[in-house]
């Protein structure tokens, strides 16, 4: 066959290549052979393209060398060059991975069926949903519709961004006034729906669709801020996830659907290919951070429990409830343990294999919990409980991931997933679940809690929860959903300006906030908030309407949740009048409470057999008109979870330095000093130290105690003032966060005084946690006497917590009229009054009170029940010594009032306050180290008694004083004294602890007291005396006395100690029970001594 000049040999049909399907598949012109007919000269366009490619390559390499040259020119280290090179390589790797992922995803979507046939042996997760799950259907017809609409959707997006979003961005910040969208293209690759699954829904008036969507688009959106020559944008994006669409409610008019709700059941996966300045987000580290932030933003409005609601008809009812419906149920997740975990810790470069430090992450939707870390354990025991709200069944999954805690990056140990539908079917699921991606198993107990719309079983649930040990939080008995709708006629700001109202809703220590609605006093929020409740009978909902600055309060509302328990179906849907607001200011809310009930045959609610009055029903005289049985009378109280969780904060105000001088004399010509004192404020209490005259470096050494709770946000406020005749001058202030002390347990710091040129304050703060054991009480009393200062009140040895629940069978007025009773609780000089319950003989108070106890052996709780406007209905005196011998130092039962009519149900709980920084905690181990006789004198710390470094000496002293090897008391008894010289304050200190085995001369025991006299002086200036104890042979005093004198003078003195008793009520004569005289020259006062001394008669007064 004749060929034209320039043609090569004709290829055979078998060798004939198919025509490329895409123009980009054509070989480049630069690589084509020259046409022979053209004289062997290359084509012009091909040569120009090759030259341009060479120049471009050379320019790029030159640009890479420019930063290296600049680094050398300015003298930077080669490390900066290497660091920049590492950043570039990391960025390049992330970019290549994203582009490779985009190409693979586009190839999959372009020919899904062919690729599916080729990849049948690929992993299950790479297959489309319609292959993986037989009940998921293909929806090609829907994809064709989306592809047809896609260009018009792009036009709408371009218009929306240019006309709505861009002006909003320009108005948000002055620096963005030149912000504009330069390019908005959704591209030619539309969103694809891989599979569709239809559910019938919970109710007949709704339809559920699960759309398995996959978007691998060539979208390109570019923005520019012309003022700063800044360009950024997106070029390519991937989004994969399951989108649930709910058509609800179905109605009888067009369009037959009232609204469409959309949300992702689980977090979708997102991958964005950035351009321009946003290329920096592809740097390793920033890439994961930016993707996480974007996913958090998407989850905030489009991942359960959040959803997007699109109403299709006007005036749709219950829009807020459609946007935030009630949960389907609650799952209580008990994370118990794990076993057989893999070991990730390696030592000596991997030669020695260690264990792991495992912790677990528990997720359900956007709800995430983290367990504590168990160090060095492959079979950890967590024993933690979490409660999660389940909104959609089926669909949501419980996910547990186990990690090994490391200083740098935590190692993955495995994960497990479980559909919540299986928990719903089983009600209680307790099993070991294998970990995927690792080795080992995790032990979970999963309980499905149903939501009940009546309070019939609330007492049963509370009784069960009371016996359940749960951490980190107590189990919940109910949930509360608050639908915040709108407010009316809120007060205006100063200058009659419209406020920007927002709402804070709080239950105990949980606070949630609404969005702010700007420039209106009639805001509409339409938001929902959810709370877990431990005891709905006693908790309250606190609502604060504020301006968005949080400084101006527009109104407040406190709503006891007990009101909901009597409302129909536990729902309140109404207007609420606001206090501290305008006369017509009100708030519209819908409150829905649901009781959490575990309906399982495994659960047996405990009862107390033999409880007196548990079923106190008068069968002979039933009440007429009652169709239900009388409720059982509870045997024990049911306080809320916060009862008994208080701490005591012990505040040592020690000294200050470099205070400013405020005193002036002669019209300011002569500069004096200051007379400083300290004021403290915490938890609604205030304290004040004594005044130190004329001193810029004062020492107070005072101790204050206050009962505190772990409510966040509390601060100890400390202010220093100069005492003056007219107005006290300010010397500075400082603050300490209470959570810092509660978490650490101890804080000893010099705090810089604020708002003044100079000055600092030395504080020592200690958290005392009550312990339910009396084993350490004696040591606590002794240590308190040692650290007691002369200017401070007596330190507390225990904390008494009282929970007043109710009373029954109180006496009536003349006839059958009920009283309005209330109760008063008194311990020492502290008292608490409960609220008044009107017109009842069986009041329910549900109140608690706490008291500081200084001498638990002698103090008592005095309770009186009174009627408003009448006298005492009954009283009760409870000696605290009964609590000291009770189990766990607690009494929880019915007490009969002294009047004989009426009973009260209360819980009295005592906790011993043991200081962790005085050495008392080690006393239980001290007997094994004590072998010295009574004649040996253990050393005492010569420093001030509050210094924590004296703990070993203090522990040694307690060991010898209370040693069981001590000699028996003499015929007249013994007195226990502690003596030392406090060198920093130049004081001789003596503590009279008590006496034992005193002599009884008459028929009745004596009323002893101790008198101390510093000889040779016999005047009132050196005489000290304890309080008097009634009718006892072993009195306890624990009282401290001080004498100001130099050490050398103290060593020349003698201390005369006399134990006396009043002989009769009418006589001034004192009976001497015994005495002892101590020669201080023979005592090492700098080290100190503490011991028992035998009492002698008046003829033989020498020390022994």
Swiss-Prot record:
Annotated region (Disordered), positions in chain: 1-48, 617-641, 924-950
Transmembrane segments in this chain: where? 39-59, 63-83
Q: Which GO terms describe its molecular function?
A: calcium ion binding; calcium-dependent phospholipid binding; identical protein binding; phosphatidylcholine binding; phosphatidylethanolamine binding; phosphatidylinositol binding; phospholipid transfer activity
Which residues carry the post-translational modification Phosphoserine, per the record? 324, 820, 941, 949, 963, 1034
Ranges of biased composition (kind: Gly residues): 37-47
A GO term (biological process) for this protein? endoplasmic reticulum-plasma membrane tethering
> SMP-LTD domain spans which residues?
135-313
Which terms are listed as keywords in the entry? Acetylation, Calcium, Cell membrane, Coiled coil, Endoplasmic reticulum, Lipid transport, Lipid-binding, Membrane, Metal-binding, Phosphoprotein, Repeat, Transmembrane, Transmembrane helix, Transport
- The positions annotated for binding Ca(2+) 3 are 406, 408, 410
Residues annotated with Phosphotyrosine modification = 1009
Q: Which residues carry this modification: Phosphothreonine?
A: 948
Q: Name one Pfam family in it.
A: SMP_LBD
Q: Which residues lie on this side of the membrane: Cytoplasmic?
A: 1-38, 84-1104
Q: Sum up the protein's function in the record's words.
A: Binds calcium (via the C2 domains) and translocates to sites of contact between the endoplasmic reticulum and the cell membrane in response to increased cytosolic calcium levels. Helps tether the endoplasmic reticulum to the cell membrane and promotes the formation of appositions between the endoplasmic reticulum and the cell membrane. Acts as an inhibitor of ADGRD1 G-protein-coupled receptor activity in absence of cytosolic calcium. Binds glycerophospholipids in a barrel-like domain and may play a role in cellular lipid transport.
Free-text note regarding domains: Anchored to the endoplasmic reticulum membrane by a transmembrane hairpin structure; both N-terminus and C-terminus are cytoplasmic. The C2 domains mediate lipid and calcium binding. The N-terminal C2 domain binds calcium ions and is important for calcium-dependent lipid binding and interaction with membranes. Two calcium ions are bound at a high-affinity site and a third calcium ion is bound with lower affinity. May bind up to four calcium ions. In contrast, the second C2 domain apparently does not bind calcium. The third C2 domain mediates interaction with membranes enriched in phosphatidylinositol 4,5-bisphosphate and is required for translocation to the cell membrane in response to increased cytosolic calcium levels.
Name of the protein: Extended synaptotagmin-1
Q: Which organism is it from?
A: Homo sapiens
